[in-house]
Design a protein with these regions (language model features):
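A short core secondary-structure module
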Residues: 1-29
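Active-site PLP-lysine loop of aminotransferase-like
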Residues: 6, 37-38, 77, 154
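Short, solvent-exposed coil/turn linker segments
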Residues: 8, 21-22, 53-54, 108, ...
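Solvent-exposed alpha-helices and their adjacent loops that cap or buttress functional pockets
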Residues: 8-12, 36-41, 60, 71
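Exposed loop/turn and edge beta-strand positions of beta-sandwich/beta-sheet ligand-binding modules
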Residues: 14, 42, 151
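Short, charged, solvent-exposed linker or helix-capping segments at domain edges/interfaces
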Residues: 14, 29-31, 55-62
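Flexible, small-/acidic-enriched active-site or ligand-binding loops
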Residues: 23-54
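Alpha-helical interface subdomain recognition
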Residues: 45-50, 61-186
Length: 186
């Protein structure tokens, strides 16, 4: 889907969405970006030079492109937050498993108060994030526009994911940086 000005004088209300075949004459698809994360979603340059598009390829009514793009952005914010919750849960699961197995002075490190505090903080952030994601998704399912809620959700949950994964690396110690252990990639 591409978004183009069909009525430049109308500002954002003059943008329309079109389905355009990537093999159409005048369309060039650039190389995929090698990103740090979100590799499931491809990021590429799309170049349009003198591309002719039939009116039947328009998505929705003329001038609705900006609204469609913003709806997609709201959805993507909530989905990014959902992915972050999954990453956090994996970080916690791996951390608990490791803390039960790893011994310091013949005692599993899970018995250390600081490790327990880190694990508890991780669990709190995960639960709060899940609640925020669920609330945002319920609003979306009800057809409510979630510009504010989607932004809050993505920001809060992403920040929590950074803290949770950092704590996981701390619990793993030097092994947290090793590719042999799963928290390195989180």
């Amino acid at each position: 889907v591409g978004f183009f000005k069909t009525n430049p004088a109308a500002g954002h209300k003059g943008i329309s969405a079109f389905i355009i075949d990537a093999d159409a004459p005048g369309v060039t698809v650039g190389a995929h970006e090698n990103k740090m994360g979100l590799r499931l979603s491809n990021t590429t340059d799309l170049i349009f030079e003198n591309v002719r598009v039939k009116a039947s390829a328009m998505v929705g009514p003329e001038g609705s492109g900006f609204k469609l793009a913003m709806n997609a952005l709201n959805l993507s914010r909530a989905f990014v937050a959902t992915l972050a919750v999954g990453i956090m849960q994996r970080a916690l699961d791996e951390s608990v498993k490791y803390a039960k197995e790893r011994k310091q002075f013949n005692t599993p490190i899970i018995k250390l108060q600081m490790v327990q505090q880190m694990l508890a903080d991780m669990a709190i952030k995960i639960e709060a994030s899940r609640c925020l994601v669920n609330n945002t998704m319920k609003m979306m399912d009800a057809g409510i526009m979630v510009q504010k809620e989607g932004s809050i959700c993505k920001t809060f949950v992403s920040d929590c994911a950074q803290e949770v994964t950092s704590n996981a690396v701390q619990i793993f110690g030097g092994y947290g940086y090793s590719k042999e252990y799963p928290v390195e990639k989180l």
